[in-house]
Amino acid sequence: METFLGILIPFLGTTFGAACVFFMKKSLGDLVQCALAGFAAGVMAAASVWSLLIPAIEQSEGMGKLSFLPASIGFWVGVLFLLMLDRLISHLHVGSNQAEGPKSKLGSTTMMVLAVTLHNIPEGMAVGVMYAGFLAGNAQITAASALALSLGIAIQNFPEGAIISMPLQAEGESKGKAFFGGVLSGVVEPIGAVLTLLAAQLVIPALPYFLSFAAGAMLYVVVEELIPEMSQGKHSNIGTIFFAVGFSVMMTLDVALG
């Protein structure tokens, strides 16, 4: 039950965020969008470092001066994996009119949801890897540290859900469809976590690689998607401040609970 709830928490964050469409005005202001994107970026960056990369290096201490190697390899594989998906799947970032990936006849709404869904894959994997390590009895991964990561991702998923559903409504979609689009973007997270847990026999022996893989993929999303979003327009300073807030929140969660 503890693992089930831990896997579900990030998805609930997306769902609650998407529900903002029912009680907020039709569109988010530029300042709010910059703040939300900055906060999400800060949480993801801190989670990548404190919850994933540092544990990956610590678990490789037996390699001595080469303890950085598994983390470096996994990190790069994660970055390249997301880069490959970006090239293979048509998608549209929030606030952009230029689609990325191969040419497609998909509507802008569908491609926008695809973009967030695509970038939620590593978050689901990160949660799955943490709980796989905890269930396997890894001394460096506790129930509290796994929960800290789940809570951190849920916190950053809340604004992410709103960033999807609110613009969809502003583009003419009904509140129900806009909410569904926001929720749909987060479905991949529990699916990714469950699939990772099912592959635990493969994951556990190579845990440092999988932890750093998730970190690399998440930081790719931060740099490629969220930082440009938080830096748009005249409110970039707000985005930077909320990046620091998000980073501090996630760092505190990880240290306090981990």
Predicted segments with their positions:
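Intrinsically disordered, metal-sensing/regulatory segments
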Residues: 1-258
